Amino acid sequence: MKDICCIGHITKDKIVTPNRTVYMAGGTSFYFAYAINQLPKDVSFSLITAMDPTEKEPVEKMLEAGIDVTLNPSRNTVFFENIYEEDQNKRKQRVLAKADPFTIRQLEHVEAKVYHLGSLLSDDFSPEVVAYLAGKGKVSIDVQGY
């Protein structure tokens, strides 16, 4: 049993500024996992994510960094386009692709004291999935997409 399990999609982000366009990985679960990985190892952690397996490079880099990651295949990877104005506090965000929602079946084998749900879009986690996990441990939810 892990102390903390973060469940959420790793995103492909297109960042557009007046000066350039870059592509990078992102998402709550991505940043959460790297932050937890910097803490002392007395807290056990795992990440459950879902993305198009042909775009799994961010997962491979996380595994190389020593992060415990389980990749569930999805038809798509969540793909955000973030367009920033000259004033970087102003942006427009578009969803260019959505990954498959997480299911109870994908999470049956997962055991943790705390489940952190890194939601990005409103249908990443059904109420049934949240209730299921709440029956197994404590649940915290990032409210960005919930």
Per-segment meaning from a language model:
Residues M1-C5:
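Extreme N-terminal starter segment of soluble prokaryotic enzymes
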Residues C6, M24-A25:
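Short glycine/serine/threonine-biased micro-segments
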Residues I7-G8, A33:
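Short, flexible segments with low predicted structural confidence
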Residues I10, L121, V143-G145:
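Short, flexible active-site-adjacent loop segments at beta-strand->alpha-helix junctions, enriched
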Residues G27-L39:
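Histidine-anchored nucleotide/phosphate-binding helix
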Residues K136-Y146:
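Hydrophobic, aromatic-enriched interface-forming segments
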